[in-house]
Amino acid sequence: MKYFLLFFLALLCTGCQLFQGQQQAGENVATEAKQEEVFVPVEKELYVIKEGTVRDKDFKIKGEAYSFPFGEKIKIVAEGKEFYRTERGDYIEKNNAGNWETLKALITDEMLIRNIDINGNPNDSIAKYLAITQISYEEYQEALKHKVDFLIEDTLSIVKKKGKLTFPCQHKTIYLKDQPDDFENPFSTTYAYVGNMPALNQYLVFEDSEDFYAYIFIDKTTGKQTEFQRFPFLSTDKKYIITVGRAYEDLEGIISLYRIESIKPFKINLLVDESTKWWAAYDFDKQPIFFSKNGYLYASMNVVANFFDEKDELNPQRMYIKIKIK
């Protein structure tokens, strides 16, 4: 029994020493990396091509709250063997950063339709109805030559008077009046007539509030109003409506697809209403979103982290996509 106790104590001591050695080895990784890294001053701009944790001056992970979002542009001021030092003084692993072309090459069809629900589970509703492909700027420009547009911009036919728009419909007249902010409603709202879509028998109105904006269809027969988060693009075969753009406040894109069931009465069925977590289309820009004769919807887009440039303006450096309705 005596020898057994001595043997057990020896094993216990050895195990403790082994655990302490492993713990010390883990703690020394960052220190060893710091000692090995020799930084050379450089000036370059790279993009985060793999979401990675931010590291401090000792190369230790700052925590989950600190991370480089996919696609973010970072200014590099020094380069070592394993890490880059950024302009703001933290560090990123070199294999987590690349140039613009490297970032673009990572944007696959699968990534563009990837969607995660609120619980973090895969959601295939976008992939079920839509195919999204990255294209070149040249292909986008060529498709623009064959743009199909069903909107008639007869903005002078309905003029606002004393802050009120009047829409004569067959069954009744619809009034939309601007709402100034006040004690009960701190957000003002204004309306602007955009035009009409004869193919759908609808007026189109833009609603602009301080905390959101939307587009409204007004049925020319019934006066019924149908609201969309973004501009409703009518497909070339007149069977579907797509809306795509960036959420007003959230750092994510949005995309919706409606199937037109009937025009008189106007009835649509919502098929897709999802957020694209890491990319968004530019829906307010000189480069338009449009349907082309081939039935595809074309748009310029960007990763959310690179949507705006350093001046907080729409980033001219962007990518292009085409969307097919299945």
Predicted segments, located by residue:
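Sec-dependent signal peptide recognition
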Residues: 2-7
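Conserved beta-propeller blade repeats
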Residues: 184-196, 226-234, 275-291
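C-terminal motif of bacterial Sec signal peptides marking the signal peptidase cleavage site
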Residues: 14-15
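Terminal domain-start segments
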Residues: 107-207
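Surface-exposed loop/turn elements that mediate protein-protein interactions on large endomembrane-trafficking
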Residues: 123-125, 138, 163-185, 209-227, ...
